[in-house]
Design a protein with these regions (language model features):
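Non-catalytic terminal and boundary segments that flank Rossmann-like NAD(P)-dependent oxidoreductase
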Residues: 1-47
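Short C-terminal tail/terminal secondary-structure segment
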Residues: 35-37, 190, 265, 276-289
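Conserved glycine-rich cofactor-binding loop
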Residues: 56-58
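Substrate-binding pocket helix/loop in short-chain dehydrogenase/reductase
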Residues: 138-139, 143-148, 245
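Active-site helix of classical SDR
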Residues: 162, 199, 207
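Residue(s) in the substrate-gating loop at a strand-loop-helix junction
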Residues: 185
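Short, small/polar-rich loop/turn modules that mediate ligand/substrate recognition or access, typified
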Residues: 215, 220, 275-277
Length: 289
């Protein structure tokens, strides 16, 4: 009798999920789950020391989690101390540390690099430039204040942090290459007239230029251009809750931040050492249209 009751309860739970999914599909025309593969490389980043800007949520947070799973020590940065604390608690590993850092404050870069290295217990091996903000104001309503704020974080801060760290690396002698991963966007490849997408175009161009400039010094630079990702930077996605439907690409769904993290790990690893200056588009086919 107990076995029958357990079976009934189990079936009821499954039916509840089915009905919920049907309701979501009816509301949004999409689906609530998708399958992605997680590769267990086996400590492919063991003992690497990694700095991830904008790591308290979304893509940066998921990259941090995956780095730690692969044996790295990580410092994640952000402007909001509360969000950083929450991220650290969720990751729940001694391999992650946090650093409150507004990357737009150029005069704080040198000091912040020193702080990050102290938290990591040594020199930085990999930089992930992920910090970025979005402002939805479109041309012709963009003000100088909006422009400056977006560019200060997305483009200017990234440039001068990369400059400062690569200058230090160039002066060093090493066997293993250093790595820089720049998080751009597929929006940077389709043309735009508002600051967010324009900064992402900047980043893709900088990635190519730095790839050429820094490779002879043992510094490998690459980038990732995600499509529309299910994070808090996508209010439409958040409004759909678990539903991942997105009509804007051939796969008809949002990307998951974990998928971007899988690609980032590959680019950080020695398996990608012959890839230089490339920005890999991961957008479900959106930019093919």
């Amino acid at each position: 009798m107990k076995k029958v009751i357990r079976e009934i309860i189990s079936i009821s739970k499954k039916l509840s999920l089915v009905f919920k999914s049907i309701k979501e599909i009816y509301s949004y025309g999409g689906y609530t789950t998708t399958n992605i593969s997680y590769i267990n490389h086996g400590d492919i980043l063991k003992d690497k020391k990694i700095l991830i800007t904008g790591g308290s949520t979304g893509i940066g947070f998921n990259i941090a989690k995956k780095c730690i799973q692969e044996g790295a020590t990580v410092v994640i940065t952000g402007r909001n101390e509360g969000k950083l604390k929450q991220a650290k608690e969720e990751i729940n590993s001694p391999l992650v540390q946090t650093l409150v850092w507004d990357i737009s404050q150029i005069n704080k870069i040198e000091e912040s690099i020193v702080c990050a290295q102290e938290l990591l217990g040594g020199d930085i091996d990999i930089l992930v430039n992920n910090a970025g903000i979005v402002n939805g104001v479109l041309f012709p309503n963009v003000t100088e204040e909006i422009w400056d704020k977006v560019y200060a974080i997305n483009s200017k801060g990234l440039f001068f942090l990369t400059q400062s760290l690569s200058d230090k690396w160039i002066k060093e002698t090493r066997i293993c290459p250093k790595k820089i991963i720049n998080i751009s966007s597929q929006g940077g490849f389709v043309g735009a007239t508002y600051p967010y997408r324009m900064t992402k175009w900047d980043i893709a161009g900088l990635t190519q230029g730095l790839g050429i400039k820094l490779a002879p010094h043992g510094i490998i630079v690459n980038g990732i251009a995600p499509g529309i990702v299910s994070t808090n930077m996508q209010p439409n996605c958040q409004g759909q809750k678990e539903n991942l439907f997105c009509p804007q690409n051939p796969l008809k769904r949002f990307a998951l931040p974990e998928e971007i993290a899988e690609l980032a790990i590959y680019l950080m690893s020695d398996a990608s050492n012959f890839i230089v200056g490339q920005t890999i588009v991961c957008d479900g086919g959106y930019s093919l249209k």
